[in-house]
Amino acid sequence: MMRSWFPVALVLAVAGSAAAQDAPGAKLYRIVDGKADAKTYNGYRRFHAGCNHCHGQDGLGSTFGPSLVDRLPDLDAFRRIVRNGTGSGTSVMKGFADDPNVAPYIDDIFAYLQARADGALGRGRPERVD
């Protein structure tokens, strides 16, 4: 009898975990003694492989894109902007929905920027939690 409930419990646990990540103010990162978890570390790598060209080193902004450390949108808005792009006036950001180096890793990039915005992670390449 217990075996028939296991798949249901597993689905509920995964759904609950995803819902917790999407809850307003939920922390997607885990920093231990200044070291980043795998998701946050991967977000650092992905951010610095492309996003930093406009948003500056460590997400601090540049003349091309705003700081994402000083003013990080909520997760839903971040996903929407990264996928679809945004623009107003002379400032335009293309969408990355079809970019295989960005689209699958939007939440990882957000986790890194959230850790930076919260002051939980300093500048530069983070060490990884073992």
Predicted regions and their residues:
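Positively charged n-region of N-terminal signal peptides that target proteins for export
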Residues: 1-5
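Classic N-terminal secretory signal peptides
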Residues: 8-11
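N-terminal signal peptide c-region/cleavage motif recognized by signal peptidases
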Residues: 15-17
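Flexible coil segments in periplasmic/lumen-exposed cytochrome c-class electron-transfer proteins
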Residues: 21-33, 37, 45, 94-130
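Gly/Gly-Pro-rich "capping" loops immediately C-terminal to redox-active cysteine motifs
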Residues: 33, 37-40, 56-84, 92-95
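The canonical Cys-X-X-Cys-His
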Residues: 48-57, 82, 93, 109-113
